[in-house]
Amino acid sequence: GATNLVTGIATANYDSVPLVCFTGQVPTSLIGNDAFQEVDIVGITRSISKYAVTVRKREDLAETIRKAFYIAKTGKPGVVVVDLPKDIQRAYGSDFYPKEITIRGYKPNTSVHMGQLNKALDILRHAKKPVFLIGGGVNIAHANKEMTRLAELTGIPVITTIMGKGAIPTTHSLYVGNIGIHGSYAANRAISNCDVLFSIGTRFNDRITGKIEEFATAAKIIHIDIDAASISRNIVVDVPIVADAKKAICFLLEKAEPLSISEWVNAINHWKKEYPIDMGRSGLTPQMVI
């Protein structure tokens, strides 16, 4: 049964979905003996989850479960696998679920690097053709209202990944569309022609970038993400910023100014009008669903 979770675990983890999976295991005394239906699920899922652990002592159960939910929800959300041997499941105890938890070596970043954000603002002030590229990190941080206000304050058009859709209303005049192979002509052309690409909460996977060497070649790239490992992994950026999306956006709201980019916005609106996504006249299409 545990192996049936593998695809779901990988998908949820790649999409930064907080998920705790409890799996059954043979008794601790039989682990490593090739017992009936014994599978090293921790080993199988370690590379596709945020954390995976086998509980080998009843005394560790309550604390491990508390840690599992804490790790899954904090920092960059992800999947935690808790493997429970049969004897641990059947054990009795009176342990209390700890209210506070400290995990050595795990300290999610929640600060805002003001120096890097000021550098990003300086680049924005001189931009003629800027765009925001918004990923799921903004939705995870519940920063939708703040993101909409930032777009309206600066006047910068907003492009989203599929996971970032909803970061601002899709009916908003500054919303361009989705990027990448599932995206619109206007969004992809805007990325190709922008001079500043301000990305928040994305990981620049291949569904977005296509050929990396041809992605936003004329742009200075600013990237905000809570996960340092996601920055400059696929696309080398000019201004890396490790920060919580909502805190960073709130800082930008205090410092940002309206930009004089009406010619650029008009060009994007022209592309949206000339090359709309054709939904067809009957039935559902993939474009309509997305």
What are these regions (language model features)?
Residues 2, 26-31, 89, 164-169, ...:
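Short gly/pro/ser/thr-enriched loop/turn and capping motifs at secondary-structure boundaries
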Residues 26-47, 170-175, 232, 236:
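Active-site-proximal loop->helix
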Residues 59, 84-173, 265-290:
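Cofactor-pocket helix-loop regions in the catalytic cores of large enzyme subunits
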Residues 136-222:
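Glycine-rich, anion-gripping cofactor-binding loops and their flanking helix/strand elements
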Residues 59, 95, 122, 218-290:
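Phosphate/pyrophosphate-binding active-site segments
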Residues 24, 57, 84, 135-136, ...:
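Cofactor-binding loop segments of dinucleotide-utilizing enzymes, especially the Rossmann-like FAD-
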Residues 37-40, 71, 98-100, 150, ...:
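Short, hinge-like loop/turn segments at secondary-structure boundaries
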Residues 6-7, 12-23, 46-99, 120-123, ...:
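Structural signature of the thiamine diphosphate
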